[in-house]
Amino acid sequence: MITPRNIFRHELIGLSVRIARSVHRDIQGISGRVVDETRNTLRIEMDDGREITVPKGIAVFHFRTPQGELVEIDGRALVARPEERIKKKFRKP
Amino acid sequence: MRRGKRPRWMLKIAEERIDILFRMADREFSANPHRSHRYTELARNIAMKYRVRIPREWRRRFCRKCYSFLKPGANCTVRIADGKVNFRCHECGHIMRFPYIREKKDRRRNKIESHTTKEGTDEQITVGAHNKCGESQSDR
């Protein structure tokens, strides 16, 4: 079960996401679905079908869990390999 | 805790993530097959890292050699030969063989057991009849 408490340890692929804030202005406000993940980036399929690769470390994301809850996460908490995120310790920046 | 063993809650998340990834792979296959191959790879990485077994329903759904996602009828053929189920991957041509000797043995054992239990019930009935009818049954 993906809950707001464990979402940064859980699977991000398949969740719908919106980029709330970003250092890079052009990607701010983009919304779509996560289709791939690497250590430093998320690949987002936008609503018009285009795909865009977004660095995790420079943005704040709004994820929507399958239950419909909205969760705000600083991308810096997500910077790790997808399989390493389960055991990553979370520190408030 | 054993060395390298992860706490229970981590393993639970790992299992959930593996299941999510394989389901996504299954859903995405018709539109973007490269994505489902990627999801299989990610799921396998998680399974190896946390030493979680990939569930039985998904174990035959990816190639053991090239790790691509397999969808029978689309990029893999399933045939039965010599007491094995053969999965042929159309991506690399590798054939995975899964013997079903255990199921065969179970069926054989069930057959024998059903015979013996039938005889047992027969005997019980005769015993009951014997108790009722006296010596006429036991003479036979």
Swiss-Prot record, chain A:
<keyword id="KW-0819">tRNA processing</keyword>
<keyword id="KW-0378">Hydrolase</keyword>
<dbReference type="GO" id="GO:0003723">
    <property type="term" value="F:RNA binding"/>
</dbReference>
<dbReference type="GO" id="GO:0005737">
    <property type="term" value="C:cytoplasm"/>
</dbReference>
<dbReference type="GO" id="GO:0001682">
    <property type="term" value="P:tRNA 5'-leader removal"/>
</dbReference>
<dbReference type="Pfam" id="PF01868">
    <property type="entry name" value="RNase_P-MRP_p29"/>
</dbReference>
<dbReference type="InterPro" id="IPR002730">
    <property type="entry name" value="Rpp29/RNP1"/>
</dbReference>
<dbReference type="InterPro" id="IPR023538">
    <property type="entry name" value="RNP1"/>
</dbReference>
<dbReference type="GO" id="GO:0004526">
    <property type="term" value="F:ribonuclease P activity"/>
</dbReference>
<dbReference type="InterPro" id="IPR023534">
    <property type="entry name" value="Rof/RNase_P-like"/>
</dbReference>
<dbReference type="InterPro" id="IPR036980">
    <property type="entry name" value="RNase_P/MRP_Rpp29_sf"/>
</dbReference>
<protein>
    <recommendedName>
        <fullName>Ribonuclease P protein component 1</fullName>
        <ecNumber>3.1.26.5</ecNumber>
    </recommendedName>
</protein>
<keyword id="KW-0255">Endonuclease</keyword>
<comment type="similarity">
    <text>Belongs to the eukaryotic/archaeal RNase P protein component 1 family.</text>
</comment>
<keyword id="KW-0963">Cytoplasm</keyword>
<comment type="subunit">
    <text>Consists of a catalytic RNA component and at least 4-5 protein subunits.</text>
</comment>
<comment type="function">
    <text>Part of ribonuclease P, a protein complex that generates mature tRNA molecules by cleaving their 5'-ends.</text>
</comment>
<keyword id="KW-0540">Nuclease</keyword>
<dbReference type="GO" id="GO:0030677">
    <property type="term" value="C:ribonuclease P complex"/>
</dbReference>
From Swiss-Prot, chain B:
<dbReference type="GO" id="GO:0001682">
    <property type="term" value="P:tRNA 5'-leader removal"/>
</dbReference>
<comment type="function">
    <text>Part of ribonuclease P, a protein complex that generates mature tRNA molecules by cleaving their 5'-ends.</text>
</comment>
<feature type="binding site">
    <location>
        <position position="89"/>
    </location>
    <ligand>
        <name>Zn(2+)</name>
    </ligand>
</feature>
<dbReference type="InterPro" id="IPR007175">
    <property type="entry name" value="Rpr2/Snm1/Rpp21"/>
</dbReference>
<keyword id="KW-0378">Hydrolase</keyword>
<comment type="similarity">
    <text>Belongs to the eukaryotic/archaeal RNase P protein component 4 family.</text>
</comment>
<feature type="region of interest" description="Disordered">
    <location>
        <begin position="107"/>
        <end position="140"/>
    </location>
</feature>
<dbReference type="GO" id="GO:0008270">
    <property type="term" value="F:zinc ion binding"/>
</dbReference>
<dbReference type="Pfam" id="PF04032">
    <property type="entry name" value="Rpr2"/>
</dbReference>
<comment type="subunit">
    <text>Consists of a catalytic RNA component and at least 4-5 protein subunits.</text>
</comment>
<keyword id="KW-0819">tRNA processing</keyword>
<dbReference type="GO" id="GO:0005737">
    <property type="term" value="C:cytoplasm"/>
</dbReference>
<keyword id="KW-0540">Nuclease</keyword>
<dbReference type="GO" id="GO:0004526">
    <property type="term" value="F:ribonuclease P activity"/>
</dbReference>
<keyword id="KW-0963">Cytoplasm</keyword>
<protein>
    <recommendedName>
        <fullName>Ribonuclease P protein component 4</fullName>
        <ecNumber>3.1.26.5</ecNumber>
    </recommendedName>
</protein>
<feature type="compositionally biased region" description="Basic and acidic residues">
    <location>
        <begin position="111"/>
        <end position="121"/>
    </location>
</feature>
<keyword id="KW-0255">Endonuclease</keyword>
<feature type="binding site">
    <location>
        <position position="66"/>
    </location>
    <ligand>
        <name>Zn(2+)</name>
    </ligand>
</feature>
<keyword id="KW-0862">Zinc</keyword>
<dbReference type="InterPro" id="IPR016432">
    <property type="entry name" value="RNP4"/>
</dbReference>
<feature type="binding site">
    <location>
        <position position="92"/>
    </location>
    <ligand>
        <name>Zn(2+)</name>
    </ligand>
</feature>
